[in-house]
Amino acid sequence: MNKLEKLRKLLLEKELDGLLIDSSKNRRYMSDFTGSSGVLLITADEAIIITDFRYTEQAAEQAGQFTMVEHKVPMTEEIANQVKKLGINKLGFEKSHVTYSVYEQYKSKIEAELVPVSGLVEKLRLIKTEEELTILKDAAKIADDAFEHILGFIKPGVKEIDVSNELEFFMRKQGATSSSFDIIVASGYRSALPHGVASEKEIQSGELVTLDFGALYKGYCSDITRTVAVGEISDELHKIYHTVLEAQLKGMEGLKAGITGVEADALTRDYIKEQGYGQYFGHSTGHGVGLDVHEGPGLSFRSNEVLEPGMVVTVEPGIYVPNVGGCRIEDDAVITDNGNERLSFSKKELITL
């Protein structure tokens, strides 16, 4: 089944006559339309994209399976017109992507029962197509190449923000639209910050430097993390690094279809606890990656979702000790029938610059 057929099956299960898609990522996933304004209206028999005059040609070109409707009245009125025309009685809308203000407009204009739903398109997005996997591999390759490049740039006296800018510039030169999120460059005491976005701090000898970054390429995200040493580091930092490395290797080795997010999380967390650092690993082991840099499934002590072939996830254990430093190591991988296939291949053994 194609994407529309799969979604229509879900609509049938939910007893919905149609679904209104407001989310830009879900809109892109279902239609391939990359414009910044528009909604999709999908029923058992129709697939409509409603947009304004700025995007009519683009929508017609990109969203070939959809009937293009240009709204010359306010968007909500055009949606109401189409709902009435199609005879929709029960209309699902994406409750996680619609503001209360927009919902109030829908309620006042649309003559149908509005049914809040969540996760329908996101459920389809969990399993990547071959085309998506090819793009994700290319996005990871850009990040790998950027890591190799940045090793020659990092040295004492260089500011974290300059490292971040160099990574971004390099990835753009390799074809990325941008970085897939605000780049994390956290050195020294700041490496104990799990999300230490690059600052004006200068990198010093004797520090660990955590680099968490990825490429946004053809709409899809890569997300890798490597931690390097600048000069000689303390025994404690060595222990932290090698504990994280061993945990990450265990996580990758055990990652496979059929296990739950809780079980995947335990692959790394149990080892870190055994080494006495459990209290310093406060986030989940990983997450899905695709059109969003953080999406399902979760590799978390809260997630009972079962991993399936075709899902793309990160494995990223970390240890963060205040006033000492921290480390995270992260790979992207696709779940396969026989385990997993790495998408990122940058060296993980400790590199000293």
Predicted features and spans:
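Active-site neighborhoods and metal-handling regions in enzymes and metal-associated proteins
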Residues: 1-353
